[in-house]
Amino acid sequence: MGCTTEFNKWEGITYDAANKKLYTAISSVEGAMENSHPSNDKGTENRIRVGKNSCGCVMEMVLDYKFSPFRSRMLTCGIPNTDPLTKAVDACVTDHIANPDNVAMISRFNQLIIGEDTVTGHQNDLIWIFDLPTGAMTRIASTPYGSETTSPYWFTVGDWDYMSYVIQHPYGESDQAMLIEAANSGICVFFCWIVVVEMQVVCALGELRVHI
């Protein structure tokens, strides 16, 4: 048995049974994951040697016959924003992920759901569909100010496909000044469903607010 303590901000994980792979979110690639900071590798064997990426990545891990990962790579990563006009609002470019937090496999379509939990990476946290064969990314949802996406899940009932996800603590962790109606604040959790038939979104059901 072996392990490493070098991972930083390791978040959600999902299993791809068809391809025998794991996909996992690394919210911020830095610290002991880097190869250029020996002080961060004290007490380790420096097995992870990648460049820093504060926008984070989704990692792919290939499993052996014992279901142990033996090879890994960064599947897709966020890209730091260098545009002086927009980087103060979105520290990561908006056509790629920022600080991924949750992942979920869509086995039927060989696609991956990626949900963000970012403060400075994107002004509004996003949910993406990543197409594994082509690498194409499609942004399918965004959240209110100050909230994060969580708990994305895809399930099939009969001929219908459903995706559910949660919008957590709107206006709660940041951007409180943007709040207009108190009822829309972080005291609520927003549950949302997207209904898909034959790869097409045919309707988006309304929000269900549950006060906590």
Per-range role (PLM):
Residues 1-212:
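Sequence/structural signature of beta-propeller domains
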